[in-house]
Amino acid sequence: MSTLGHKSDNSLVSNAFGFLRFPLNFMPYDSDAEWVITGIPFDMATSGRAGGRHGPAAIRQVSTNLAWEGNRWPWNFDLRDRVNVVDCGDIVFNFGDAQSMSDNLQAHAEKLLAAGKRMLSFGGDHFVTLPLLRAHAKHFGKMALVHFDAHTDTYANGSQYDHGTMFFHAPNEGLIDPTHSVQIGIRTEYDHDNGFTVLDAAQVNDRSADDLLAQIKQIVGDMPVYLTFDIDCLDPAFAPGTGTPVIGGLTSDRALKLVRGMQSLNIVGMDVVEVAPAYDQSEITALAAATLGLEMLYLQAAKKTK
């Protein structure tokens, strides 16, 4: 026999249904999954180049390049041996209706969290993090935010809602505590008086990863953490396929070292956003996003014993 029902598929190009070929489960609330992958194909809140709606599909497609590895380096264990993950596909919302997306995503997240699941989400533009934060704050209370980005996304913009204002609204709604939150890789204009600790790109590139991680852990403390990674945190040399690229960013190696070093944080939710494959070269941006998502899952699995 030669279908997925009868054998494992190790091809790098076929059967890219779920992220990393994790099983698809469109009713994940009733499953035995611990972590649920959700795609959010939304880019209506984008200020510059659109195309993030195609991000989840691109990330899933390129993730087949990562699915073959069992005892992944440098973790030296197989993720599947320690944590049960399913991909529930993409959220459904009314085309052209941003409120529908926000409401449906928040309701989906609330139902998953109430069922004892945790979420790794793929955007989509960065606005999608706001309804995710609302759901997670209802379940876990006020959280710390660990935020990788070229932009702080704390701009008021007349109090409008877009992919650059989520972290202006989130503290005002009581979802996150800026004094226990860190923004990493910033290299654009920002308000220095909003309470967040900003580790700008120059610091992150020049200081040791161990030094940075010690500071991050001190700031975050024991609070529940929401981890969000805007792919434009990476330098465009490593992630050209995004809507608002900014030169002078992190290397993929530096980003991986920082993410891998966050094992002691109490991470309760995670996302990777702003992949716009129309501007990508050789799928390197999608591959970076897929790899970061995989490393985030390994970060959780590493806390568990066999």
Curated annotation (Swiss-Prot):
The superkingdom listed in its UniProt entry is: Bacteria
Q: Which co-factor is required?
A: Mn(2+)
Family statement drawn from the similarity comment of this UniProt entry = Belongs to the arginase family. Agmatinase subfamily.
- Any idea which positions bind Mn(2+)? 126, 149, 151, 153, 230, 232
Q: What is its EC number?
A: 3.5.3.11
One Pfam family per UniProt: Arginase
Specify the pathway: Amine and polyamine biosynthesis; putrescine biosynthesis via agmatine pathway; putrescine from agmatine: step 1/1
The molecular function terms in GO held by this entry are:
agmatinase activity; manganese ion binding
Q: What is this protein called?
A: Agmatinase
Keyword terms: Hydrolase, Manganese, Metal-binding, Polyamine biosynthesis, Putrescine biosynthesis, Spermidine biosynthesis
Give the matching Gene3D superfamilies: Ureohydrolase domain
Quick check: keyword Nucleus in the entry?
no
InterPro entries documented for this protein: Agmatinase, Agmatinase-rel, Ureohydrolase, Ureohydrolase_dom_sf, Ureohydrolase_Mn_BS
Q: Which HAMAP family match?
A: SpeB
What does this chain do?
Catalyzes the formation of putrescine from agmatine.
Q: Which reaction does it catalyse?
A: agmatine + H2O = urea + putrescine
- GO process terms (BP): putrescine biosynthetic process from arginine, via agmatine; spermidine biosynthetic process
NCBIfam families per UniProt: agmatinase, PRK02190.1
